[in-house]
Amino acid sequence: MAAKKVSRKRRVKKNIESGVAHIHSTFNNTIVMITDTHGNALAWSSAGSLGFKGSKKSTPFAAQMAAEAATKVAMEHGLKTVDVTVKGPGSGREAAIRSLQATGLEVTAIRDVTPVPHNGCRPPKRRRV
């Protein structure tokens, strides 16, 4: 019996000049997603998908690597300028923004869209180390 051919979905190259880089930085991981201005995803990466495990995912270096990986894929689509939206309290926020600028994207705006509760859910108890 012949081996089945697995068809891979080929990436269609789009010509998109400007987009939005969404950086979601939690205490445990950093996710970088680059979209066009309408919100359609061009590229994404996270510290966990790059092979960082456990507490290494929450480091600024892991966030930097995630931003570089997403930027490389997005620049293949012709991306040049990007607005940055940052969400979350994690340690990889600034490192990811610096990495976007260092890889050749022009950052036009930085927006913090971290959700702030109007006294909603009770937060988790404080850590005692």
From Swiss-Prot:
GO MF annotations in UniProt: rRNA binding; structural constituent of ribosome
A Pfam cross-reference name: Ribosomal_S11
GO biological process per UniProt: translation
Gene Ontology CC terms: ribonucleoprotein complex; ribosome
InterPro entries: Ribosomal_uS11, Ribosomal_uS11_bac-type, Ribosomal_uS11_CS, Ribosomal_uS11_sf
This protein's UniProt keywords: Ribonucleoprotein, Ribosomal protein, RNA-binding, rRNA-binding
The family this protein is said to belong to: Belongs to the universal ribosomal protein uS11 family.
General function of this protein: Located on the platform of the 30S subunit, it bridges several disparate RNA helices of the 16S rRNA. Forms part of the Shine-Dalgarno cleft in the 70S ribosome.
Subunit structure: Part of the 30S ribosomal subunit. Interacts with proteins S7 and S18. Binds to IF-3.
Name of protein: Small ribosomal subunit protein uS11
Organism in which the protein naturally occurs: Enterococcus faecalis (strain ATCC 700802 / V583)
Source species taxonomy: Bacteria, Bacillati, Bacillota, Bacilli, Lactobacillales
